[in-house]
A protein has these predicted regions:
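Short, surface-exposed coil-to-beta transition loops
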Residues: 44-45, 55-59, 108-116
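A short acidic-to-branched-hydrophobic micro-motif
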Residues: 49-77, 127-132
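Surface-exposed amphipathic alpha-helical segments
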Residues: 32, 129-155
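N-terminal "mature-domain start" segment
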Residues: 20-54, 83-85, 96-97, 149-153
Length: 155
């Protein structure tokens, strides 16, 4: 009887894990808020990309959330590979830790472009990216506020 119960629990656990993998990305995000405040540019089961409705904002944001394969998510060198990529494109690394990288991609003629990429496993294995266009240089605190805003979409 004990073996049967353990077997049953194992099957239920595997079923739960399999069901989680099949969930659409929107089941992890506050879609009501996203739909009311942003334009959805691209959406499928694995990813969603949305932008500010007001294109003339002084700080224009593009958010991208993507479910990742477990093997890619668990790669301990994923941030290092991103850093290598950005440095190869002559970008300036503003901040980097084991799950987040913030990069100044372009600064010219009072225009600034930033990328923030972060990985979150609180609900599922998600990659979050925020691309920012600004008419002023943003402080590290302002960039972290944008990262916090991106994280706030995860329910």
């Amino acid at each position: 009887m004990k073996k049967f119960l353990i077997f049953l629990l194992a099957v239920l656990a595997l079923t739960f894990v399999a069901c989680e993998k099949d969930k659409d990305i929107e089941s992890y995000l506050d879609m009501e808020r996203i739909n009311s405040e942003f334009n959805i540019e691209k959406q499928d089961k694995e990813q969603i990309k949305f932008t500010d409705k007001d294109e003339s904002r002084s700080v224009y944001r593009i958010f991208n959330f993507q479910k990742m394969k477990s093997v890619d998510f668990k790669n301990p060198k994923k941030i290092d590979k991103l850093e290598e990529f950005y440095l190869g494109k002559n970008c300036e690394i503003i901040y980097k830790d084991e799950s987040t990288i913030i990069v100044l991609v372009l600064a010219q003629d009072n225009s600034y472009a930033y990328n923030i990429q972060s990985f979150d496993d609180s609900k599922t294995e998600l990659m979050m990216a925020v691309s920012i266009g600004s008419d002023k240089e943003l402080s590290e605190d302002e960039l972290f506020n944008l990262l916090d805003e991106a994280k706030s979409f995860i329910k």
